[in-house]
Amino acid sequence: MNLEERLAGAVRHYWQTRLKQKETQGSVTGVQDYGARADVTGGKHMDGFASLICDLIAESGIGAECIHKGSRSDLPGYFRPAKDWDLVVVADKRLLALMEFKSQAGPSYGNNCNNRVEEALGNATDLWTAFRENTFGDSKAPWAGYLMLLEDAAGSTSPVRVAEPHFKIRPEFRDSNYEKTRKSVSYAKRYELFCRKLVLERLYSSACLIMSDRESGLLGKFTEPSADLRFTDFVASLTGKATEYKKAKELEGH
């Protein structure tokens, strides 16, 4: 099975899990959420991506005992005691890599998009400040990855009206008809710009943006809106870090 097929499996798992959670949520407690919240309160919808990345890291030569998620993925911070990352790689007491897997489906794109931006920026600031302060022992700068799966829908791909009471938004955030409509780019385009800037500003080593609609997504269908945010490049960057570690270990004589 090639990488694209394996990624399709993770996308399919995401949508199938959301659908199952929406159907069963509240069946045990009797408390029923409504709307999109019912899709996600059960968690685990991004587990397919986490499992795929774990497998790819192991295939690159890093022992499974070095790859951690769940209760063993916490790392100390600088502005807070600890942060539970979605996946962490620690080998020979050195922090090699860490990842965040995020998703967003409609209908509430606005507040959720802003929350995702603030969360990622805060996590990165906390991580690199902790690294600067030698919180992770003898570790060299770790590889930090950010993966976003966004629902491909009218709400995420249409221009958005934006308030400008004092100053205009930056040019890259303006829709092509901005001068007439005073609308910003879509949330999909915002996420594309955001992921690109995370890497440009060296807050994350690599970022990936995947889009999928909830109907064809059940079959594993997806698109990648930007060539520089593709999953293949994301994986290549990560496995490159693993190769770098293995070569360094060989030179150390281990």
Feature names for model-found ranges:
Residues 74, 102-115:
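Short helix/strand-bridging catalytic loops that position acidic/His residues to coordinate divalent metals
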Residues 81, 88-98:
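Active-site beta-strand-loop-beta-strand hairpin of nuclease catalytic cores
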Residues 1-25, 29, 175-254:
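Charged, low-complexity C-terminal accessory regions
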Residues 95-106, 145:
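Glycine-rich, often proline-containing surface loops adjacent to acidic residues and nearby aromatics
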Residues 110-216, 220, 224:
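Acidic, metal/cofactor-coordinating or nucleic-acid-engaging core segments within structured domains
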Residues 28-50, 97, 140-159:
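Short N-terminal secondary-structure initiator segments
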Residues 71-87:
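Charged, often glycine-rich, active-site loop that binds/positions anionic groups
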Residues 1-69, 75, 254:
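Interdomain/boundary linker segments immediately adjacent to catalytic/signaling cores
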